[in-house]
Amino acid sequence: MLRYELRGAAVLALVLALAGCGKKVDDAAPLAFVPADTPYVIANSEPLPDATSQRFAQQMKVAWPFMLDSIDHALAELGKDDPQSAAMRPVRALLDEVRERDTPEKWQQIGLGSKVRSAIYGVGLLPVVRIELVDVDAFRAMIARVEQKAGAKLTTAKIGTQDVWTFGNEAVLGLMAIEDKHFVLTAVPAAADEALKRRVLGLDRPAQSLAASGALAELDKTQGYLPYGSGWIDVRCTLALLIDDPSVAAFARGFGAPSPTFEPACRADFERIAANAPRLSFGYSTLDAERMAFKGRLELAPAIAQALARITTAPPGPPAGKDSFLDFGITLPLLKARDFWVEQAGAVAKAPFQCGALAPLNETFAEAREKLDQSVPPPMSDFSGLRVTISHFGWPDGAAKPDVSGIVLLGSSNPGFLINLAQLSVPALRDMKLGTDGKPVALPRGTLPAEMAGDLDVHAAMNPSALGVAVGKDEAARLGAALAAPAAAGGVLLDASYSGEIYTAFSQMIGRFADVIPAEQRQQLESQRKLYAFYATWFKRFDARVTVGNDGVDFIESVEFAKP
């Protein structure tokens, strides 16, 4: 019998060995320094593709001067009491070093590249930034020039054989180092021992790295993220570390605050909270020269996800076409939303948190339940959603008001009641007949104040689930089509879309109101105006969507770039 067990163990060992041979880990990659159990991480495990990198480089070259203007303004505000303070001098010296670097080639002259791998992650709760350098000597030379211009050298120390730069105060110690071809920046409690410093700097590697575990690669595969910027915040791990990570108490002592104390009940309560929303993950799903899409998922406990899905239908009307100036829809089922939150507050009331640190949370839920657990009168109780579509927006020179056309849809289980209220409030509407057939009817003269109405075409229409208003020429037909369209699929909390032309409008409005803006703000706003004007040439379309599914809430944002 023992012989067969040994033979089975040998076969298992061989299989594991072969599996290990098939999975080669790059020990020089930033992910090889990230602990597999890190509570948070965002990393690009592969460099950007050439086409994407070139697109970003073109945009950066134009935007860089305006970004510098904003930074200069912020620094002027921070240092207005003492612009030559010891703290401000190195910051200004660093800014001078990068001021003219508006192309990838110029950044490479100081050792930084656009096609490198990097990671931001936690060793415990302590943050670490790790970036590949393209030229270590050039980076060191840049730091030397910054020191010379600032008139002071950075404080240095040795951790083992590793040279580090240090900075900070009596509570926080910043560490900066060049390790092989990596630039590493981190922070620890000022009283941290050498063992902790070695861990955060990666001089002592984690027992298992994220590269070896493959967890980030698996996340990318499961969620459809690209390897150019993805990661997570692990809520369960983060809350557990508030109790277990000694750095929390060390920072508190450094700042002269009492060390937080967590009784045994806190661990169970933190786990209970984390079980409801265990993780937020995020990453690019598209990233090329034509389009960029970013997705985030807040994972939820199945019971909460299902309860949230039950109240999530869809905003009224279909999303507008890609030719709209702006389209925004949101689900607003007030009664169902109230019931959802009353249910959540009731769960806390039934089983209050026992952790002393969470006592305010018990009080908050109790107060919320008391305020929410009341009758909601119509028309508020009838609301189900809202959609605003602006088809056209312009503000011609010399015009007193903008030229706007579009439609508004208000979802309601009783839209006729809204019409009745409007007729009671506005005498001009009393004789208007509006059926539930979705056919637009022109609003009578006198409905709107003369200064607002002008020569506007204003129509209203209604179906059994929504009331709509159209403003502008040809918008009545659009309103009728929106009300006649089939109901959209459920599960949508919010959808939004807008044209890159919105930045042209922002730029024009800043210019239009320049005379009434305080003089000290005009220079900064002028830079912002120019930047908006450039945005209008870069971006063709923005789309955003928030949906609820069985696994949680998804946030999706996409950008279509304008053709150069």
Predicted regions and their residues:
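Bacterial N-terminal signal peptides that target proteins for export
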Residues: 1-10
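Membrane-proximal interfacial segments on either side of biological membranes
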Residues: 244, 334-340, 417-420, 502-513
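Long, C-terminal catalytic modules of enzymes
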Residues: 472-476, 483-564
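Bacterial N-terminal signal peptides
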Residues: 9-17
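Single conserved position on a long alpha-helix in the C-terminal lobe of the eukaryotic protein kinase
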Residues: 42, 92, 96-218, 381-492
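Structural boundary/hinge residues at secondary-structure and domain interfaces
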Residues: 21-166, 215-279, 293-397, 426-429, ...
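Active-site proximal loops enriched in glycine and acidic residues that flank catalytic Cys/His/Asp
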Residues: 296-298, 330-332, 410-412, 462-464, ...
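Signature of lipid phosphatidyltransferase scaffolds
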Residues: 204-207, 220, 224-231, 495-496, ...
